[in-house]
């Protein structure tokens, strides 16, 4: 009777058994992945962790007519489950009292009165009478209750639109969103779950001198930017508008909402890769101390030694101290004998088959279609190419390339005929660089703005025609530029000059890739979507369930980037040519960012490399048929769109249902007005008034987070791990006749080339970085996969997701088939590197393939 009274009524009480899967705090310690989980901490948990079910059908007048709570149930014995659990997880039994009136539980409250936090993965009620199994996907850290201002609540895996939420659960749904939003004040702590916005005012460190001051990005017309996650750290002493920074040694502790932090396997992999790369970086440095030219590679053999010979492990007290300080798990990883030992970098794909094919014109051009930055090339639509820069400020910036420069290489066509036949293309790095070039060249960088013209040959490959290199006029910006045009040559010093011209282009493309294609267009633009989704869409919302996997680890990797990569004096500034102007440049480029244009078909049409064509499979027809990124990308895009269409159509049948969804409307409003607030007045934002607008927007969000990021990230080491192929910096200008540099170029062209591009120190640092960024961690979740098979209770979306997975498997087979087709010369090229960057799945490590669900590295 007492129990009956507790849960409402005097009916016979029954027992409902459940299984709780959790992980204790120090099971996640990367130094002890295999640690036993049945230790005293968990033994003590039993009576210190309580669960209370919340009824979705029986109200409690004493609780404001919200769902009735069951009496508390506590963790019981350790269970041996039939399904194997992941490393570090443990299952426990829990038994609830239940009666008929209580009905179906829609949520539960958990209270942790233990001193430690733990990771709660799931609760499954095995057999609720008249209902069967009820599953709660949790995947959340639960801290001691005194850390929270409100109860920790988890909902069952049945999605509901706001208007369809059971009445007794609505207040819980609303309150949980209020908790996640916070009140916009205070410094965030490790246990907080609050999602909020801030500008990029934390890149500089003005307290450490003028050289460490950086412009705030976001919140101004001059430097607009997507918002980042708010940490609430106090301002710097010298500038109240700049946020103070945490010490480098505490970088891993930078605030992100607790459940956004890397999981234990990822953190272990990440730290191991970082340590491994650092050691690889340090050892050649020690070696270079005994070299006559310590910051120079003297020959290409010198560069190749990084991958082939390696350096013998030094013995002695220093090495012993180093190994003693490294945890055992890490030592096993560092000293593996599978060709990736600590003493050398893995051989990048671009030089695996041939050590020299990267230098060919064909490979130079092919990488614009199938390399790590295949999203810049566009069709030439006016000749000579014109600039869009303001002539009042920058004078005449139009190209000086003439028909005489290129017509002898157009297979008998005139320039007009070649353009009309869609045969001329351009890699244009002129307008984006000119406003900053004068300042960039005051640093150790010495480089040019560039335009590269290419001709589409009958065999489907591209041929470089001319490279224009431009410098700001010495008398001032308003006088325009001084330009010089270079054309291909394979004879004598002209051949060496042509190789250098291509290197300057590669430097530009490398910087634009890292700052724009990679950081801005994937990492930075997606973070506001992560924040808004958690603030405005309940975990019960179907669109939250759709998008959630595509936000995994993004806030954490971006926070770490702000701490050690893109900050003043960080690794990015140290390794890319724009140096301290890098992030400011990306803000200027963000002015032209258009959300609907991030959709792959729209992007291809905008760049002129495709035309709209309703009779083509994906609604567009490629003008370069053998364009590996676009061909594979359109297949992936269509698969994502088909899946999103099936999913959204299940929940929304009319415009009215979209318009009356208050969470969805609040989400979209906040994204436009706050998350991407510097662009809130742009006319191109979808209104979010129709199911089609929702489908298109969600498809684009998923595309950016998954396939676009994979295409521009995981090819970094395969193509740029060998720095001569994609140098990040140029240190001197093109040699002029009559100078010692020109004589050196004639006598020792390789040495002159290496003295022009990235120096040894920068190379080692840059290669170390991109090796880390190009690796998949062992716990990666790929497109078409989910963390839990129980992510939703709705059968139709589950079936649609299964169909999506099968479609991606078919696409993998097609990619393998295309890569084996010798007619498609751009698929592998002279370096024999098959295009696999949009191959959906991968194993862990440095694979050059695989599309993770999210921007997770």
UniProtKB/Swiss-Prot annotation:
Chief location category: cytoplasm
SUPFAM superfamilies per UniProt: Lipase/lipooxygenase domain (PLAT/LH2 domain) (SSF49723), Lipoxigenase (SSF48484)
GO terms for cellular component: cytoplasm
Activity sensitivity to pH: Optimum pH is 5.5-7.0.
Molecular functions per Gene Ontology: linoleate 9S-lipoxygenase activity; metal ion binding; oxidoreductase activity, acting on single donors with incorporation of molecular oxygen, incorporation of two atoms of oxygen
UniProt KW Repressor keyword: no
GO terms under biological process: fatty acid biosynthetic process; lipid oxidation; oxylipin biosynthetic process
Alphabetically ordered keywords of this record: Cytoplasm, Dioxygenase, Fatty acid biosynthesis, Fatty acid metabolism, Iron, Lipid biosynthesis, Lipid metabolism, Metal-binding, Oxidoreductase, Oxylipin biosynthesis
Protein's UniProt name: Linoleate 9S-lipoxygenase 6
Chain's gene name: LOX1.6
């Amino acid at each position: 009777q007492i129990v009956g009274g507790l849960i409402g009524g005097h009916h016979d009480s029954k027992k409902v058994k459940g299984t709780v899967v959790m992980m204790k705090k120090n099971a996640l310690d990367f130094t002890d992945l295999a640690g036993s989980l049945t230790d005293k901490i968990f033994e003590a948990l039993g009576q210190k962790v309580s669960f209370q079910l919340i009824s979705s059908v029986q109200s409690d007048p004493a609780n404001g007519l919200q769902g009735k709570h069951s009496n508390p149930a506590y963790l019981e014995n350790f269970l041996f489950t039939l399904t194997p659990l992941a490393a570090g997880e443990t299952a426990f039994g829990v038994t609830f009292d239940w009666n008929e009136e209580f009905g179906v539980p829609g949520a539960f409250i958990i209270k942790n009165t233990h001193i430690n936090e733990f990771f709660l993965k799931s609760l499954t009620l095995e057999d609720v009478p008249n209902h069967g199994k009820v599953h709660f996907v949790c995947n959340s850290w639960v801290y001691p209750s005194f850390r929270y201002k409100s109860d920790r609540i988890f909902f069952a895996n049945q999605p509901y639109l706001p208007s369809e939420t059971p009445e007794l659960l609505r207040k819980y749904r609303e309150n949980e969103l209020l908790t996640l939003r916070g009140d916009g004040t205070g410094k965030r702590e490790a246990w907080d779950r609050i999602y909020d916005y801030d500008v990029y005012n934390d890149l500089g460190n003005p307290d450490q001198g003028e050289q460490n001051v950086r412009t705030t990005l976001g919140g101004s017309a001059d430097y607009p930017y997507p918002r980042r996650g708010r940490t609430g750290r106090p301002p710097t002493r010298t500038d109240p508008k700049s946020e103070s920074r945490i010490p480098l040694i505490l970088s891993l502790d930078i605030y992100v909402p607790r459940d956004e932090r890397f999981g234990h396997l990822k953190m272990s992999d990440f730290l191991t890769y970082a340590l491994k790369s650092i050691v690889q970086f340090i050892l050649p440095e020690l070696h270079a101390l005994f070299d006559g030219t310590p910051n120079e590679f003297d020959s290409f053999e010198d560069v190749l030694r990084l991958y082939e010979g390696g350096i013998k492990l030094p013995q002695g007290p220093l090495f012993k101290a180093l190994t003693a300080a490294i945890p055992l798990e890490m030592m096993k990883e560092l000293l593996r004998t599978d060709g990736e030992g600590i003493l050398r970098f893995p051989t990048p794909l671009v030089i695996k088959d041939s050590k020299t094919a990267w230098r060919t014109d064909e490979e130079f051009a092919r990488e614009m279609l199938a390399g790590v930055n295949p999203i810049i090339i566009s069709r030439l639509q006016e000749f000579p190419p014109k600039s869009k820069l303001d002539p009042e400020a920058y004078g005449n910036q139009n190209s000086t390339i003439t028909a005489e420069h290129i017509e002898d290489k157009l297979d008998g066509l005139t320039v007009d005929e070649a353009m009309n036949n869609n045969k001329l293309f351009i890699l244009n790095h002129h307008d984006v660089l000119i406003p900053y070039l004068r300042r960039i060249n005051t640093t150790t960088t010495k480089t040019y703005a560039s335009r590269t013209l290419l001709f589409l040959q009958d065999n489907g490959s591209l041929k470089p025609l001319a490279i224009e290199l431009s410098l700001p006029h010495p008398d001032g910006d308003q006088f325009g530029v001084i330009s010089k045009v270079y054309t291909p040559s394979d004879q004598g010093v002209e051949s060496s000059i042509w190789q250098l011209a291509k290197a300057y282009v590669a430097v530009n493309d490398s910087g634009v890739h890292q700052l724009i294609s990679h950081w801005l267009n994937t990492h930075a633009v997606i973070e506001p979507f992560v924040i808004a989704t958690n603030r405005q869409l309940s975990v019960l919302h179907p669109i939250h369930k759709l998008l959630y996997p595509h936000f995994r680890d993004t806030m954490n990797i971006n926070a770490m980037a702000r701490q050690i990569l893109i900050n003043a004096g960080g690794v990015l500034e140290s390794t890319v040519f724009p140096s301290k102007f890098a992030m400011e440049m990306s803000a200027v480029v963000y002015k032209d960012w258009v959300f609907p244009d991030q959709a792959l078909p729209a992007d291809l049409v905008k760049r002129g490399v495709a035309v709209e064509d309703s009779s083509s499979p994906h609604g567009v027809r490629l003008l370069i048929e053998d364009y590996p990124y676009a061909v594979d990308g359109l297949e992936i895009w269509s698969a994502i769109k088909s899946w999103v269409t099936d999913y959204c159509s299940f929940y929304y049948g009319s415009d009215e249902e979209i318009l009356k969804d208050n969470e969805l409307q609040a989400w979209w409003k906040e994204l436009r007005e706050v998350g991407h607030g510097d662009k809130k007045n742009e006319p191109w934002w979808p209104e979010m008034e129709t199911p089609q607008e929702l489908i298109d927007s969600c498809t684009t969000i998923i595309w950016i987070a998954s396939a676009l990021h994979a295409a521009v990230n995981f090819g970094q080491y395969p193509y740029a791990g060998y720095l001569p192929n994609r140098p990040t910096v140029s240190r001197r200008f093109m040699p002029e006749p009559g100078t010692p540099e020109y004589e050196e170029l004639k006598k020792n062209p390789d040495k002159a080339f290496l003295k022009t591009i990235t120096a040894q120190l920068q190379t080692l640092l840059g290669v170390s970085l991109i090796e880390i960024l190009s690796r998949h961690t062992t716990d990666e979740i790929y497109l078409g996969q989910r963390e839990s098979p129980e992510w939703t209770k709705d059968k139709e979306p589950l079936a649609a997701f299964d169909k999506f997975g099968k479609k991606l498997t078919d696409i993998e087979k097609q990619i393998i088939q295309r890569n084996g087709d010798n007619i498609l010369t751009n698929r592998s090229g002279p370096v024999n590197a098959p295009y696999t960057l949009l191959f959906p799945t991968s194993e862990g490590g440095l694979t050059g393939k695989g599309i993770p669900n999210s921007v997770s590295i």
